[in-house]
């Protein structure tokens, strides 16, 4: 599966199939959330949250790819990510793009 953030695939002719998307809501456990709260007092990267967001992006992307595959797509173009805070310590990641067939 080819994944690109452009609205084309260089050197390829494509046929649009459909919008595809994937999403997930992730949260950290209380212990890691507490330690991250302490880290905000001294500054620096909140590694527990960075890991949470990386995992969420991967899950959402995999869900989008599975939807594209189910439609017979060879690629997803024009991919975009969006995030939002759901509550303290939890975030939603949404990824969407256009499923296409390479001709």
From Swiss-Prot:
Gene3D superfamilies: Hypothetical protein apc22750. Chain B. It holds the Pfam family YbjQ_1. It comes from the Bacteria. Transmembrane segments: none annotated. PANTHER family: UPF0145 PROTEIN SCO3412 (PTHR34068:SF2), UPF0145 PROTEIN YBJQ (PTHR34068). HAMAP family: UPF0145. Belongs to the UPF0145 family. This is UPF0145 protein NT01CX_0170.
């Amino acid at each position: 599966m080819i994944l690109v953030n452009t609205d084309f695939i260089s050197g390829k002719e494509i046929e649009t199939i459909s919008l595809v998307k994937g999403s997930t809501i992730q949260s950290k456990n209380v212990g890691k959330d507490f330690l991250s709260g302490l880290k905000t007092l001294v500054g620096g990267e909140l590694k527990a949250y960075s890991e949470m967001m990386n995992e969420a992006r991967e899950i959402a992307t995999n869900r989008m790819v599975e939807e594209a595959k189910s439609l017979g797509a060879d690629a997803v173009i024009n991919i975009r990510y969006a995030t939002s805070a759901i509550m303290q310590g939890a975030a939603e990641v949404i990824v969407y793009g256009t499923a296409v067939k390479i001709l």
